[in-house]
Amino acid sequence: MSLSGLRDELAQVRTKKKEFLEQIERIVPWGRWIAMIKPCYYKGERGNKPYDLELMLRLYLLQNLYNLSDEATVAEAMDSRAFSEFCGVESSNQVPDGDTLGRFRNILVHNGLQEQLFAQVIKLLREKGLLLKKGTIVDSTIIAAPSSTKNQDKQRDPDAHQVKKGNEWHFGYKAHIGVDKDSGLVHTLKVTAANVHDVTMTSKLLTGEETVVYGDSGYLGAEKREDAIITNHSGKHIRYKINRRPSQMKKGSARSQAQLKRREHEKSSVRAKVEHVFGVVKGLFRYRKTRYRGLRKQTAKLNMLFALANLILADRRCLLA
């Protein structure tokens, strides 16, 4: 086979990376997102002409999808065929440097655009009837932050805190989410330091339209708090189906324990949907440890990741068609 023939054959090979990026190409609402960012982007009235906004957005999405640094993202855009095709670039001269990508990300953070992009996805899902608002699953996950003081500032991230989970201590942040119980998609996201207790965030994760709330034992007593939402906007009572602690399952007769286990299993089977979205963010996107310091940047990062996770999960279930 000639070199040109081999090159043509390789161009037709569909790698997993290429297939994944073709999915992203199809599901991202490019027009909406670009229109939202454009007013905050460089106008190009002075100095050098800014890089194309869509190119910068595509690079930024790649950075989030693959958990890459600024420098690694632009390097991949030049070296990886799948990345360069996704970005629509043919030579290294068309790709900005890492500092330029970092400045673009800071524009998004400064203007709260990641939160707006997440809200835009929620709006899109509502338009398609994918958020039924009948019930919410509340849950959280810890995102670790570097605990070492061996850095330029000689200190740990001042906005991050430590919390004990089981027998282990964790330092970092916590992503609290409210998930639609029917579709398994995230409708609400709040980011705090890791030491904020789950139950204190319950009311902030509800839409006010649900009739039932599911959560693990970390949310026990949520309905008794002063800020608890007891009735929804229609005046209907909200039921809190919170899993009991294992120690509470050992009381009573064998028959009552069996009945209790069945009820708890039913609650857990509903709650299991929340693990799918965490699986995308921490598994597929590999975001288990922070890259940036400060609650503001962490909130922005997680809003972007959960926006993308919602689109991917909705597409997997053929809900975006």
Where are these regions (language model features)?
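Amphipathic, well-packed alpha-helical segments that form the structural scaffold of globular domains
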Residues: I34-Y42, I122, F278, K282
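A short glycine/serine-rich beta->alpha loop
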Residues: Y42-G47, E90, Y292-L295
